[in-house]
Amino acid sequence: MNTAQLSIQQYIKAKDGNRPYLLDQAFASDAVLDMVVHTGSISFPPHVEGIGPIGDVLVRRFGQTFENVYTFCLGLPPEPQARTFQCKWLVGMSDKSSGEARVGCGVYEWQFSAESGLVERLTITIEHMKTLPASDVHCIMKWVSHLDYPWCHPEALVNNSPDIGTLEEVIQYVTADTAI
């Protein structure tokens, strides 16, 4: 049986590494994905049902557009038998076509099966998705590649963040002490 933490980690490994075959170690076959996007710089369908379509959206199509993907869950992982879990997240990546860097953040809301530990429902809220010039890719990748992965404390993230004005809203969001 999976644990909540392992299911989350397998999802991140699948998405970041463009490995859709790993999703069956993260999601139930009839899982549901809801996307809430509060930015115009990236788009996703608002509702997806089933592991196949979820894989198309979160791994296959995502992997066609982005590379050098690092996704972080901020804070401590869930308890092994957790039925629900919420955390802020941060992603750093680069666009395959333009070479531009992307840094985004938001909230994950997970619901897990009591029997299998697999994800039954995931709501991903995207609060910010910043686009930076290709000249910033190196410093963004240097930053994110040195963070604890995939579980990272917000303080560590901020202490090592590059001094780029475009990132201010992202840094403020992930460090804000607000209830999720």
Task: Show which residues each predicted segment covers.
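Generic signal for short, ordered secondary-structure residues
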Residues: M1-N2, L33
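Terminal "cap-and-tail" regions of soluble proteins that handle hydrophobic small molecules
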Residues: N2-Q9, K13-A14, G92-V103, E109-I180
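Short, well-ordered alpha-helical segments enriched in acidic and aromatic residues
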Residues: N18-D34
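Short, surface-exposed linear patches
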Residues: I54-V57, Y70, M93, Y108-F112
